[in-house]
Amino acid sequence: MQVFVLIYFHMKKRKTKLRSHCPVNYGLESFGDRWALLILRDIIFRGKKTYGEFLKSEEGFATNILASRLNHLIDVGILKREPDEKDGRKDVYTLTEKGLDLIPLIFEMVLWSAKYDDQSEAQRITPLVELIRNDNRRISKKVIEQVRRGEGIVKDYLS
């Protein structure tokens, strides 16, 4: 048993070793995967919290990919998992402080997409896009508080 634990720990540690300490690489290895970013989007914009809610995302998560990305985001300290107070059979996923600090970056991605994707759904949240464009830092602080309370933000900014 002790040998297995040591091997498992070593494998886990090796798996998360960074390829370099370039700041861009660190971000990519932490959260720069399509599926990881969609999980962050669902928490921030839609207020999703459970595995089942993430599974219903329109992009169609495969169960193994979803489980893998949730575990990775927990391992790198972006998400935390706790038992649901209302239903102990479920887990609730929330952003840590490290995860909340990604909100301004996610907002910059929204601006970039709104600029270059003619069919961007950012058109549905024009008020939010304008707030981000005018003062990302201020709106990010407000949104961080909403997300801390477990609220999705899209409903507040639909055009």
Labelled PLM ranges:
Residues 32, 85-108:
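Basic, amphipathic "hinge/linker" alpha-helix immediately C-terminal to the N-terminal HTH DNA-binding motif
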Residues 58-84, 88:
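Canonical helix-turn-helix DNA-binding module
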Residues 52, 71, 91:
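Residues within the helices of the helix-turn-helix
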Residues 1-31:
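N-terminal leader segment of winged-helix/HTH proteins
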Residues 22-62:
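N-terminal helix-turn-helix DNA-binding core of bacterial DNA-binding proteins
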Residues 1-10, 104-159:
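C-terminal regulatory/oligomerization modules of transcriptional regulators
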